[in-house]
Structure formats: structure tokens, C-alpha cells
Design a protein with these regions (language model features):
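Non-transmembrane "mature" sequence context
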Residues: 1-134
């Protein structure tokens, strides 16, 4: 993690906006609440509040949590570049994958282990699918 990300403060509005976007994506990926909480490193109550979309609700998240949100958003953006079909955009993450890294597990299963390395490595492999698109 870069020093700039570690020291950058995020407003509660930025935190809520990012968290709600990530939770919405995770729901479309068919992540259950336990998987989402482990992946984002948030409590069950924070997850529930994010889903309720109460406009008065605010939350402060740390740099690690914001980086996790960033990975979810970037994985989603990459999948939208790779696939035209919404079923693939939202279904890919929950499908079993026989790639050596995934070893028959879904990307969601790997990410839901909860450690940053699993999240990063999953992002890296999905991002590599873009190949020469850039």
C-alpha cells in the first residue's frame, strides 16, 4: 500500500458512497453477508446499514477498508470492459474457475478469505484478462 493512501483521510460521505457502491456490486455477485463482511473488513451492522441506504447515515472507514472497496470497484470495472453480457459481468466472480490460482474455486471464494493478498491477487488475475485491450 502506498504511503499516500495510508495517510489520506476520507470524508464520511466518501466512505458511505464507496461502501454502498461496493455492497451493491457484491450483492450482484451473489456474495452472502458473511463473505461481504470478510471481504470489506466491516461489521455485520455496518453492512446492514449500508444496504438500507439511509441518507442520514454516515460511517468512517480506514485506509485498508477503502482499499478493499477500491479493489471491488476496479474488479467490477474490469469485468465490464471484458464482458458485454450482464450475466457474465455479474456471474463471473461466483463461477468456479479452473485457472491454476483459483484451483476450481470461484474468485469470490478466494476474496472472501478476507486477507488483502487474496483480494489483490484475484484483482490482478481478473485484470490480466483484459490482455491487449489497452
Amino acid at each position: 500500500m502506498s504511503l499516500a493512501l495510508q495517510t489520506q483521510g476520507f470524508s464520511k460521505n466518501q466512505c458511505v458512497t464507496g461502501l454502498r457502491a461496493a455492497v451493491g456490486i457484491l450483492e450482484k455477485w451473489q456474495a452472502n453477508s458473511d463473505q461481504a463482511c470478510r471481504l470489506l473488513r466491516i461489521s455485520r451492522s455496518t453492512y446492514t446499514r449500508a444496504r438500507q441506504r439511509d441518507p442520514a447515515w454516515a460511517v468512517a472507514l480506514d485506509a485498508d477498508q477503502m482499499q478493499r472497496i477500491s479493489f471491488v470497484l476496479n474488479i467490477h470495472a474490469t469485468l465490464r470492459l471484458i464482458f458485454d453480457n450482464p450475466q457474465n459481468v455479474y456471474g463471473f466472480v461466483s463461477m468456479a474457475n479452473d485457472n491454476e490460482f483459483f484451483n476450481g474455486r470461484s474468485p469470490l471464494e478466494i476474496m472472501a478469505q478476507g486477507d488483502m493478498i487474496s483480494l489483490y491477487e484475484t484483482f490482478r488475475r481478473i485484470d490480466a484478462l483484459r490482455g491487449g485491450q489497452w
